[in-house]
Amino acid sequence: MISSNDFRPGVSIELEGSIWKVVEFLHVKPGKGSAFVRTTLKNVQTGKVLERTFRAGETVPQATIEKRTMQHTYKEGEQFVFMDMETYEEARLNPEQLGDGAKYIKENMEVNVLYWGEQVLNIELPTSVILEVTDTDPGVKGDTATGGSKPAIVETGAQIMVPLFISIGERIKVDTRDGSYLGRE
């Protein structure tokens, strides 16, 4: 059990049979009446966002989420298959479960798979990945003076905005949180 006074961003709680992650919280002490905690919660399974108010000191069950490091071994149809390198257990996830993270996963990449009991919830990607540019417009001499950007398709199929001097075959570093170009590798 966790007290509403101990809520912080990233804390996971069980509410109405689901796992919710605290995104924001605000401890409010009105001049009249008792204090309360106003929270913004995100459902880990569905992504639904909920505003919820708790009395100060109210206790709720804390979710026990286990992180297992797994390797993306292959893609079967639309499903991504991950394997635990210690137990050789497999976990299969749909692109809907992965959200935007599916655009950055390549074979043999290690990720943290989040489990609630035996149920796979989601994955945690590294903050940046190295991807090879497979398609982009060719750079022309003198393009760098304007400091513009152009779209590029990387090996996973994701479209990334890159500087004009990037060409096909180059390896670039991409931020998995927002899909931005971080630099050459």
UniProtKB/Swiss-Prot annotation:
Matching entries from SUPFAM superfamilies are given as: Nucleic acid-binding proteins (SSF50249), Translation proteins SH3-like domain (SSF50104)
Database matches in InterPro entries: Elong-fact-P_C (IPR015365), NA-bd_OB-fold (IPR012340), Rib_uL2_dom2 (IPR014722), Transl_elong_fac_P/YeiP (IPR020599), Transl_elong_KOW-like (IPR013185), Transl_elong_P/YeiP_cen (IPR001059), Transl_elong_P/YeiP_CS (IPR013852), Transl_elongation_fac_P (IPR011768)
GO MF terms listed in the record are:
translation elongation factor activity
State the SMART domains in the record. Answer: EFP, Elong-fact-P_C
Q: Can you say where in the cell this protein is located?
A: Cytoplasm
Report any one BP term from Gene Ontology.
peptide biosynthetic process
Q: Which UniProt keywords apply?
A: Cytoplasm, Elongation factor, Protein biosynthesis
- Top-rank lineage group of the source organism: Bacteria
Pathway listed for it is:
Protein biosynthesis; polypeptide chain elongation
The UniProt entry lists the main location of this chain as: cytoplasm
One of the record's GO cellular component terms:
cytoplasm
Ion transport as UniProt keyword: no
**Can you tell me which family this protein belongs to?**
Belongs to the elongation factor P family.
NCBIfam families the UniProt entry points to: efp, PRK00529.1
Cite the HAMAP family for this sequence.
Answer: EF_P
The entry's protein name is Elongation factor P
Q: Which organism is it from?
A: Gloeothece citriformis (strain PCC 7424)
